[in-house]
């Protein structure tokens, strides 16, 4: 379907029903409707993979990452299925300036949910010195002036850092992403996010995507020398083929005690080990229980979204809305679900 038309419906129709969601791609009511459209199609693809080439390594880039991955890994637990996202690349851009060293001298451990993760540990490789003291010293000044560069668009200094600063102040850890994604998962986000900057980002991202084929050839865009997207799929495949046993900074896999505060089998974003067996998650020791409570708030709505997708259940979709921290009105939630199914019947009409 029309990605941006549907996205804007996911965003605006819930707001008409009282939702205070801020982005509507991965979390909140919009994240649910996005999931209900795209997850069934990816599950169908994986149904075929399981029949034709069950030992294949399968990588997903589609959002909403944790809900798509959870639906697939619930139905096909033996499939070698991994979610990938380039959001972690922000650390490579930012930490060298903050820590005054090359990124090759920095070791990080980050994790949480996709688009809702934090830098748990960071240190200098040469000295093994903790990197957080200097990050904390320079944090406010650096991020207040930081300009986000994305798809040829430059933001105002400090844009999309309202919730970002609030989370750092409250929990003491560096968020990996900015307000547009962080705000999708928190019921109080709407009162602190930089909504104007989120809107600017969305409008410029939409403009860039819709003019993509007018400005650059497909082959040029994906040429390795010119690709600034920091996608890691090729190095990951190489590491699997070569049985390298190297660590990847961020992969999305079902939780197996990698983050102790999140139920097992909920898909989490953690470091991963790459070898001939594929991708294996790495446990994040000392993950803060405080931030872990925010992750845990998402578990129920993720599980119910999967149930709605796999069982074509409208009731489960409704319960997924009620489980979402961003939803605070059960009557409007029912009206919203009915309105969205009616509005997007082509994609959501399977829910009975």
What do these predicted ranges mean?
Residues 1:
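Carboxylate/His-rich catalytic cores and anion/metal-binding grooves
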Residues 4-75:
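Rossmann-fold NAD(P)-binding glycine/threonine-rich loop
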Residues 30-37, 56-60, 79, 83, ...:
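Conserved aromatic-histidine-acidic binding/catalytic patches
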Residues 34-41, 87, 228, 297:
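Soluble or luminal CAZymes and related metallo-dependent hydrolases
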Residues 44, 48, 71, 90, ...:
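Alpha-helical scaffold segments in soluble metabolic enzymes
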Residues 46, 50-56, 83, 233, ...:
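Small-side-chain structural scaffolding
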Residues 52-53, 57-126:
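Rossmann-fold dinucleotide-binding core
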Residues 100-352:
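Long, compositionally biased stretches enriched for glycine and/or charged residues
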